[in-house]
């Protein structure tokens, strides 16, 4: 059975053409870049030997600073220093204000309601800010590797939605990077440990970073990772450990209130104590004129409630995944906070096995991304990692007006299943034709037809009342199954096709080029088709209503006014001006409002006929 085409269009896999590629962990608190050199994946360091780049950007009046120099400006220049921009990616300003009401930035909304940070250098959106972090990482990689990057793999949380993933890719494009793939962070961690070539089964990835906690339950089947469930807490991380220790120290010192400088000094001391206690049983402290110590046991008592919260999230994720803790084969630890021995002990006890900790937990995600990038760049043509199988072109369905509704976007890793609900267009419709297409264009005529089948036995209902759930499922062998199910009766039909059969790399490349070349033209054609479909719906509905109730509820003049509105809309519908059709629909709706109200009153009277007030 032929697999889906898994090579990127135009990619060369010739062994002598070694390409420079990198894996990027674009993190909430810190970011890293890694690459495979001499067959080994490792993180790339800056001029001072540091692999970590703080995910902080300062837009000062004099310069843009990224990383450590930017972090130093956080206290003195908070309005122009953006920390944890990853939290803002792909979100509306309204959403951000609800989730993070205490951010120090000066926000304003774009025309589409997206957040814009007002800085000394002008307006900056989250994509631009993320791009500056990516540029800094790319410059480090270029300097270290001695050449331009052919492509990168960027990791994202497994729970990132489409908007957040698109925003991440846009940021990379703005940074001048070619994205080979977006890779789920837990999958990257599993790849770093070589679990993709190990025993099949369930893997847990416990990710406790500086500001967030994520738990992911994965299933490895035939070399392909499937995300079964995710969970966590976007406001719980190692920073919270530091604050608990700082509060404890404040109580020990006997201070009731603190200046900002004292608070920062306590936090720094707390962070250092936490680090020391990963190796020693006691940490000595000298802060704000106070000398004392903190034991590992005291630390464990302080952080136990937070750790319990993470384990509750693990329990929920296992329940969502439908698996028991003892079914988990391996537990991968990610994030600097998992260095704490108590964290490792508690997680090990919960899952009943020793977690994997041999790879630096700060670096494990970037290393996994680097391994994936090396393969995608064509440097390992014989690699057997089936995780590379992707949908080469989007899979969609034809809707009214010859439009394409994409169900599974291109570059989605397989296996995958996606479902969407559709409804009937006409009153009394008892069958629906399902047309499966492949391609990136907006209109069916410009895409490749894969299959057609019919769903029959839909109960006669008013247009829009039926609920038909269409599911697209692509298995690890690239076999597409399409199922259509009418929800009220359970009637269903299905078909199986091989979506990539008969397409060469050149044909795929050409289809992608066409989608870009005709993008504007396609969107205009789609807008016109959508307005025509809506006009048809309005015309058909109004004609049907006039036939049913026009004689009873309208006088001749009112009837003629509506008929003229319908004729005008039909004339506009047959034209090529989408805006004119849209206005015609609005005018027709306005002209028919009184008629619609009378029909509603009639329906209510009919429903109440023969019933007393007490019955109602």
UniProtKB/Swiss-Prot annotation:
<dbReference type="GO" id="GO:0005829">
    <property type="term" value="C:cytosol"/>
</dbReference>
<dbReference type="InterPro" id="IPR043129">
    <property type="entry name" value="ATPase_NBD"/>
</dbReference>
<comment type="similarity">
    <text>Belongs to the heat shock protein 70 family.</text>
</comment>
<dbReference type="Pfam" id="PF00012">
    <property type="entry name" value="HSP70"/>
</dbReference>
<protein>
    <recommendedName>
        <fullName>Chaperone protein HscA homolog</fullName>
    </recommendedName>
</protein>
<dbReference type="GO" id="GO:0016887">
    <property type="term" value="F:ATP hydrolysis activity"/>
</dbReference>
<comment type="function">
    <text>Probable chaperone. Has a low intrinsic ATPase activity which is markedly stimulated by HscB.</text>
</comment>
<dbReference type="InterPro" id="IPR018181">
    <property type="entry name" value="Heat_shock_70_CS"/>
</dbReference>
<keyword id="KW-0547">Nucleotide-binding</keyword>
<dbReference type="GO" id="GO:0051085">
    <property type="term" value="P:chaperone cofactor-dependent protein refolding"/>
</dbReference>
<dbReference type="InterPro" id="IPR013126">
    <property type="entry name" value="Hsp_70_fam"/>
</dbReference>
<keyword id="KW-0143">Chaperone</keyword>
<dbReference type="GO" id="GO:0044183">
    <property type="term" value="F:protein folding chaperone"/>
</dbReference>
<dbReference type="InterPro" id="IPR029048">
    <property type="entry name" value="HSP70_C_sf"/>
</dbReference>
<dbReference type="GO" id="GO:0031072">
    <property type="term" value="F:heat shock protein binding"/>
</dbReference>
<dbReference type="GO" id="GO:0140662">
    <property type="term" value="F:ATP-dependent protein folding chaperone"/>
</dbReference>
<dbReference type="GO" id="GO:0051082">
    <property type="term" value="F:unfolded protein binding"/>
</dbReference>
<dbReference type="GO" id="GO:0016226">
    <property type="term" value="P:iron-sulfur cluster assembly"/>
</dbReference>
<keyword id="KW-0067">ATP-binding</keyword>
<dbReference type="InterPro" id="IPR029047">
    <property type="entry name" value="HSP70_peptide-bd_sf"/>
</dbReference>
<dbReference type="InterPro" id="IPR042039">
    <property type="entry name" value="HscA_NBD"/>
</dbReference>
<dbReference type="InterPro" id="IPR010236">
    <property type="entry name" value="ISC_FeS_clus_asmbl_HscA"/>
</dbReference>
<dbReference type="GO" id="GO:0042026">
    <property type="term" value="P:protein refolding"/>
</dbReference>
<dbReference type="GO" id="GO:0005524">
    <property type="term" value="F:ATP binding"/>
</dbReference>
